[in-house]
């Protein structure tokens, strides 16, 4: 069994791949800079969190409807109900994990000495 050597990337191919990135993200000056839309980023992050929590809530509601429909006999398809409940459980578990990590980071910052 022969192993072929890795062929280096041709410089022209590398430049063609980097051109769209460089056009969209020009490098201006050296050192840290404050983005012009810094306040907008904070608002976008808050909006992102709100939308993510709303999605988790919607999945929980769908799972409740599916389990109620399964219990009352309105839903005959067991896999759809189980899939809805698993989606809701996984999304809630992920949300709790993210919350725990954020709290751990907050506590770590609060323990830092100035």
Curated annotation (Swiss-Prot):
Q: What Pfam families does UniProt report for this protein, alphabetically?
A: FliE (PF02049)
Task: Report keywords, A-Z.
Answer: Bacterial flagellum
**Record's InterPro entries?**
FliE
Q: Which GO terms describe its cellular component?
A: bacterial-type flagellum basal body
Q: Which domain of life is it from?
A: Bacteria
Give the intrachain disulfide bonds.
none
Q: Which GO terms describe its molecular function?
A: cytoskeletal motor activity; structural molecule activity
Keyword Membrane belongs to the record = no
Gene Ontology annotations of biological process type: bacterial-type flagellum-dependent cell motility
Which NCBIfam families does the entry mention?
fliE (TIGR00205)
Q: HAMAP family of this UniProt entry?
A: FliE
Tell me which family the UniProt entry assigns to this protein.
Belongs to the FliE family.
Q: Which PANTHER family does the record cross-reference, listed alphabetically?
A: FLAGELLAR HOOK-BASAL BODY COMPLEX PROTEIN FLIE, PTHR34653
Q: Quote the protein name from its UniProt record.
A: Flagellar hook-basal body complex protein FliE
Q: Which organism is it from?
A: Desulfitobacterium hafniense (strain Y51)
Q: Which gene encodes it?
A: fliE
């Amino acid at each position: 069994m022969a192993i072929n050597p890795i062929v280096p990337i041709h410089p022209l191919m590398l430049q063609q791949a980097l051109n769209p990135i460089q056009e969209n993200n020009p490098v201006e000056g050296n050192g840290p800079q404050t983005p012009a839309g810094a306040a907008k980023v904070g608002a976008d992050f808050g909006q992102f969190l709100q939308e993510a929590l709303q999605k988790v809530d919607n999945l929980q509601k769908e799972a409740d409807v599916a389990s109620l429909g399964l219990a009352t006999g309105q839903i005959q398809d067991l896999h759809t109900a189980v899939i809805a409940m698993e989606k809701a459980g996984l999304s809630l578990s992920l949300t709790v994990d993210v919350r725990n990590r954020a709290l751990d980071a907050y506590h770590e910052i609060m323990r830092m000495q100035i």
